[in-house]
């Protein structure tokens, strides 16, 4: 019965949802049946109940719907069909059961007791509990009908295993040693253990019972309750189980309460129980019963003392009150006096404030008067009224401006005198008469009129100039050059590029040849890249002149030398290189005129070209042609002026001091700001200096129909990858590319030099670093990553298709060829046809490329050029868009690049786009370039050196530049979105519409591509941080900390700042040319040597004392005085000088010490000494070994007064030198250290020479080991250490670099004394090679092969 109830409960728990769902479905079908009516009768099949609970629910449902048979006819039919199926199954079951019962033997007896034992045993086994022995000793019950095989066990007796430990111990004679053990009085422990175990097991069983345990009674079925009613005994078993569980859990509490109760009753019984408390035995145990209370009796003496104490307190209180009253009166008096004093001070302060306000008002009035006067002076200066300006300046008494004006006037006067001197010198050479100038004429002389005193009007070009007709501005340029010629001066023709400086120079030569009858010879010096163009121009414009083109191979030049020697030519056209190479031939002529093209090459007055021309060549006139007369600073402009007019501009310092002040905003901590008046005054004086000797016209002035040139600065964002790399390089001067990456250190760090250059590379494109591309794009294929990782490429990805669609052609200028390689991949990916020209392009290829690009129907869209190689001598006006990918430090290089397209012949507006990365080093470079252009604008452009602009125009232009410098707006800081970019790029409204359309098409294509990849939105155009590989997203501070050295001590070391490198010019050049040493190492080496020299001079060594304390004899002091030596000691030594001198005589008996005196002349040898120390040599000069005092000749010392350093060394031989030149040597008891050192060296050297031939033989055999593939010597890579410049990280990663030459050197000088040390050094060399190079590389393989060879060699020679 219990089993059936449990089965019923489990069935209800497990299958109730299924039956409920089935009944719900039947109910829904019944409702649907009622709605359908008689139209159609669907059949419903109810699944058979799988438990009695489901059957009961089906009965409940059947009873419930019997009251409404019409509405539930279909459901009733389905339930009755189910009941029929159940009845049929029951009949089948009973039939099978009867068949089974009939098959059982009639004589079989059912043993209920045995079955119960079997069940109990199974339950015990289920709980992993041992079965008791009496369960195992069951009688053997066999069925008579069953047949068994009888086995004879007579031969084999089973082994009896006893579980009784005591019995087994007793049988073995192992009785317990504790014979006096007493049994517990509270029962059997085994019984207690079994009871506790059963209680815990029962608690576990009750806790594991399900929470939804319920009981179902058949009485409720008979009462026909609905399914929503709860059973009357639903929670009976659950409550009983909870009561039993809580009762069992109370057992511990009951035990503790019982223990407390027993303890409390037993311990408090004699206090709480009356008859025990009143017992005499209990009372006797209490001490209080036996003690009598003490009676306190007052004493008279104590009373008297108390009264005396009270009187004393009252007396003191009165005295204190009197004292307080006196102090309060004093305080009141002081407060009264203070208030009176404060009121007096307040009146004084008020009077002072009135006086100060009066003085401030007077100062303001005076300031207004000064400003009003300054404005009047400025107005007079602008109106060019010099007399009024000087009068106002004299009234103002402005000493600063007066001094400035006086100095500039003196400089202009000196220049005027120099101009006259040069003109007079030229006149004397030509035999003309020199007219003296009076003082009155000197004061009224105009500087420009002095220079161009002789004027000559030119209306037509020379007849032998037949190549074409000169334009008006070219005739004016010819007229200016002829005026210089007439006035015996030289000048600079600085017309903007494209205005025909070449033609004007040829016209000057033809004019002098035809009109002035000056038959030359003329020398024209040009760059090699433009000599072809000059040759063509001479052939076209002046074919009648006998022109020699001096260039080519030595044989070609040799064939022309005879013609040059005899002077059978009119013009010699050559290059800078041959001017220097063949100066012995070319400098023999007295040249009539020297013309130098691209004259900014002469900006360095100390260059070899300037030196050669100035010192070897003789010429009557000089002319410099340059489109950029001022590229960086004013001294470069002075260098050009000094070259053409050496007599006039002969002091660079004077020129820079007076005219560089308004532009030199750096160089001192306190910046000297000039007022607008001072700036105008200085610049006007500078214009006065330059105007006679410099002519510059701009294309926009002389060619009015030339289209405009519009330059726009486009700001580009940094991608996530660029930001990470930029911060790494900025903070650590290195990149973290992950451990194991080729080219990086063991920790994955790639150290780099020249931080600014590396930052520029990162701004251009991160893939310039191969290690970065290997991590981000391992396949190195062309994909969207090319523009997603770089902001500039992302911008070009949006811009270039628009230019292509609108028919514009693009010139793109770069500073780095690596970026050009990446751009080529990008253009190929975008299917844009391009051409490339850089420094490696040959001259003949350049001409072909220019012709192909400039062809009328050329299909080339883009021309990639390097700024330095493609910025000169190219005509590319068929393109109308120039993109400056990265800005050059020299802004004139970018201007030259822009003028490739903006030149005469251009028909479209030229749009210049300069790409600048936001918040990067490129902004600093651009700012610096703008400063250089600003100087050029103020000095050159504002001068309007075209000989026709008025003073008002010059002043207006100059004022506009100065105002724009102070009020420069930063409206181009933010990056441009698509709409703003289209506004910038579009040259018309139609292009704006076209560009907007292209942007929409691009966005639609990006959405389609994202959808094809399964993305909801397109990825950002620039790669983000979360898309980068893990290497670039982790915190790299720890990696860089590992590379750094450990800090020394707890005190932070101060960083030492050096303001020079300490190298001479020769040492600097040697360091630059040395491949085995970087410039930083050379500077560091030089500083260490200088520090050692300083310590040696000060005497601060480990075994030296910086005092003169122990001078042994008085004769030594007199010796120093007689030879006029002065000892140079530290401040501490000087402080104790008198004391130590007095003690010297008394200490003569102490051990002798060495005094080493080093004169200032020894400093010449410090470089050699430091070099020998750094190389590890132990060289000691013989003079130092043999003598302790080095003294120079007395006569020389008296003249030069050399500074001496006195060094006192302990435990050394003392050598004294008397006035007569004799030496006295005092030897210590022990052997001389010098002899010991010499003996030790001799012994070491002889021992090292013993192994050196053997090692040399080993090296020779190693060098004979050749590779099987290409037969290269395996030792070739190990001969010397790699270059520090090429492999700077090698010396950071490898702790002990080693090479064959180092091993041979160490063997030769005795560092290695045994073959074992040589073997270890070779092993170190091979380990370094295997550690630094990848496994499988040829260096790695060579190291393994050589290692095997040396191991075999050492085994043979060790035996």
From Swiss-Prot:
<dbReference type="InterPro" id="IPR027417">
    <property type="entry name" value="P-loop_NTPase"/>
</dbReference>
<keyword id="KW-0547">Nucleotide-binding</keyword>
<feature type="binding site">
    <location>
        <begin position="495"/>
        <end position="502"/>
    </location>
    <ligand>
        <name>ATP</name>
    </ligand>
</feature>
<dbReference type="GO" id="GO:0031055">
    <property type="term" value="P:chromatin remodeling at centromere"/>
</dbReference>
<dbReference type="GO" id="GO:0140658">
    <property type="term" value="F:ATP-dependent chromatin remodeler activity"/>
</dbReference>
<feature type="modified residue" description="Phosphoserine">
    <location>
        <position position="38"/>
    </location>
</feature>
<dbReference type="InterPro" id="IPR001487">
    <property type="entry name" value="Bromodomain"/>
</dbReference>
<dbReference type="GO" id="GO:0005634">
    <property type="term" value="C:nucleus"/>
</dbReference>
<dbReference type="GO" id="GO:0140750">
    <property type="term" value="F:nucleosome array spacer activity"/>
</dbReference>
<feature type="domain" description="Helicase C-terminal">
    <location>
        <begin position="795"/>
        <end position="956"/>
    </location>
</feature>
<keyword id="KW-0067">ATP-binding</keyword>
<dbReference type="InterPro" id="IPR038718">
    <property type="entry name" value="SNF2-like_sf"/>
</dbReference>
<keyword id="KW-0539">Nucleus</keyword>
<dbReference type="GO" id="GO:0045944">
    <property type="term" value="P:positive regulation of transcription by RNA polymerase II"/>
</dbReference>
<feature type="compositionally biased region" description="Basic residues">
    <location>
        <begin position="1233"/>
        <end position="1246"/>
    </location>
</feature>
<protein>
    <recommendedName>
        <fullName>Nuclear protein STH1/NPS1</fullName>
        <ecNumber>3.6.4.12</ecNumber>
    </recommendedName>
</protein>
<dbReference type="InterPro" id="IPR049730">
    <property type="entry name" value="SNF2/RAD54-like_C"/>
</dbReference>
<dbReference type="GO" id="GO:0000785">
    <property type="term" value="C:chromatin"/>
</dbReference>
<dbReference type="GO" id="GO:0016586">
    <property type="term" value="C:RSC-type complex"/>
</dbReference>
<dbReference type="GO" id="GO:0070577">
    <property type="term" value="F:lysine-acetylated histone binding"/>
</dbReference>
<feature type="short sequence motif" description="DEGH box">
    <location>
        <begin position="597"/>
        <end position="600"/>
    </location>
</feature>
<dbReference type="GO" id="GO:0006355">
    <property type="term" value="P:regulation of DNA-templated transcription"/>
</dbReference>
<dbReference type="InterPro" id="IPR029295">
    <property type="entry name" value="SnAC"/>
</dbReference>
<dbReference type="InterPro" id="IPR001650">
    <property type="entry name" value="Helicase_C-like"/>
</dbReference>
<keyword id="KW-0378">Hydrolase</keyword>
<dbReference type="Pfam" id="PF00176">
    <property type="entry name" value="SNF2-rel_dom"/>
</dbReference>
<keyword id="KW-0103">Bromodomain</keyword>
<dbReference type="GO" id="GO:0015616">
    <property type="term" value="F:DNA translocase activity"/>
</dbReference>
<dbReference type="InterPro" id="IPR014012">
    <property type="entry name" value="HSA_dom"/>
</dbReference>
<dbReference type="GO" id="GO:0006368">
    <property type="term" value="P:transcription elongation by RNA polymerase II"/>
</dbReference>
<dbReference type="GO" id="GO:0140008">
    <property type="term" value="F:histone H4 reader activity"/>
</dbReference>
<dbReference type="InterPro" id="IPR036427">
    <property type="entry name" value="Bromodomain-like_sf"/>
</dbReference>
<keyword id="KW-0347">Helicase</keyword>
<dbReference type="Pfam" id="PF00439">
    <property type="entry name" value="Bromodomain"/>
</dbReference>
<dbReference type="GO" id="GO:0006302">
    <property type="term" value="P:double-strand break repair"/>
</dbReference>
<dbReference type="Pfam" id="PF07529">
    <property type="entry name" value="HSA"/>
</dbReference>
<dbReference type="Pfam" id="PF00271">
    <property type="entry name" value="Helicase_C"/>
</dbReference>
<dbReference type="GO" id="GO:0005524">
    <property type="term" value="F:ATP binding"/>
</dbReference>
<dbReference type="GO" id="GO:0051321">
    <property type="term" value="P:meiotic cell cycle"/>
</dbReference>
<comment type="similarity">
    <text>Belongs to the SNF2/RAD54 helicase family.</text>
</comment>
<feature type="compositionally biased region" description="Polar residues">
    <location>
        <begin position="1108"/>
        <end position="1126"/>
    </location>
</feature>
<dbReference type="GO" id="GO:0016887">
    <property type="term" value="F:ATP hydrolysis activity"/>
</dbReference>
